[in-house]
Amino acid sequence: MTIILGIDPGSRVTGYGVIRQTGRTLEYLGSGVIRTQADDLPTRLKRIYAGVTEIITQFQPDMFAIEEVFLAKNPNSALKLGQARGTAIVAAVNRDLPVFEYAARLVKQTVVGIGSADKSQVQDMVARILKLSDKPQADAADALAIAITHAHTIRHSLHVAASAKTTETQEKLTALMRTRYSRGRFRLKV
């Protein structure tokens, strides 16, 4: 059983989603957004840090997955997004959580099957995968999709290790994955 916290970073709205993975089963635990007022950037970053820390305290996740920064048309927006993302990562690292990063395109590909899926498609598929009666709000759905992507990555990686031809190879692959996952050094890009 693994609890995964997914974060969709933003300087004004940061989405979060928490799921529990037990074998092949994914269970929804909670989601929402951290909204910051139109304060100055340092105050917004402080609110993001406090919000992520509070979520970690409430749900006690084992792993932290976050969307990578994409290149925005506006460099100032990209810098603010990077700062919000860094703030969320610091909150996770301060609680000794391993951090995993995923490209937005990979998240959409994993959850929807199309790397260029729109927000509505992500919301629909997240609700379907987690058997939710209502669609989560867009930023929370993105965060849940990031957590689902990480759960899928773990399951696939362990399947690869289990399908190795020899016990020695299985042990080496399993040890490698445990090391990578415990240190949070796993990055996937598409």
Curated annotation (Swiss-Prot):
Similarity field: Belongs to the RuvC family.
Subcellular locations according to the entry: Cytoplasm
Alphabetical list of HAMAP family matching this protein: RuvC (MF_00034)
Subunit structure: Homodimer which binds Holliday junction (HJ) DNA. The HJ becomes 2-fold symmetrical on binding to RuvC with unstacked arms; it has a different conformation from HJ DNA in complex with RuvA. In the full resolvosome a probable DNA-RuvA(4)-RuvB(12)-RuvC(2) complex forms which resolves the HJ.
Organism from which the protein derives: Actinobacillus succinogenes (strain ATCC 55618 / DSM 22257 / CCUG 43843 / 130Z)
Binding site for Mg(2+) 1: 8, 139
Cofactor note: Binds 2 Mg(2+) ion per subunit.
Name assigned to this protein: Crossover junction endodeoxyribonuclease RuvC
Annotated gene: ruvC
